[in-house]
C-alpha cells in the first residue's frame, strides 16, 4: 500500500534512485496505491550526470509493494521493498533495463514494455 509521502526504490536505469509519492492517479479521494497503479512522484535521490534530476516531478508505475498481493487463485505475493518504474506520458518506461522481479498483473494493465524488459515475472 503506497500513499502520499511514501518513499520508493526505482527499479530501472532511468537515473533516479529514490522517489517520494505525491499523488495517486485516478479518483480524487483515493488513499492507497497498489501494484500497477500510476503515481505522481518527486525524485529524492538521483544518479549524477543523469537526464533526471533531484526534485523533478515525474510519473511512475508501481511494480513491487511490501504489502501482500492476493490473487484470485489464492496465491499471495509479497516483496521485500516498495519499487516503481519511471514512465513517460504514454506509459513507456524511460529506462532501458528493469531490475528485480515484477508482478504478472502489469501485463493485464497494458504495461507490456515493462514486462518484456523485466528479468523475472511472478
From Swiss-Prot:
GO terms for molecular function: large ribosomal subunit rRNA binding; structural constituent of ribosome. SMART domains: Ribosomal_L14. Transmembrane segments: none annotated. Keywords: Chloroplast, Plastid, Ribonucleoprotein, Ribosomal protein, RNA-binding, rRNA-binding. InterPro entries: Ribosomal_uL14 (IPR000218), Ribosomal_uL14_bac-type (IPR005745), Ribosomal_uL14_CS (IPR019972), Ribosomal_uL14_sf (IPR036853). Its main location: plastid. One of its GO terms (cellular component) is cytosolic large ribosomal subunit. Pfam families: Ribosomal_L14 (PF00238). It is found in: Plastid, Chloroplast. One of its GO terms (biological process) is translation. The keyword Ribosomal protein applies. Binds to 23S rRNA. NCBIfam families: rplN_bact (TIGR01067). PANTHER family: 50S/60S RIBOSOMAL PROTEIN L14/L23, LARGE RIBOSOMAL SUBUNIT PROTEIN UL14M. Belongs to the universal ribosomal protein uL14 family. Part of the 50S ribosomal subunit. This is Large ribosomal subunit protein uL14c. It comes from Populus alba (White poplar). The gene is rpl14.
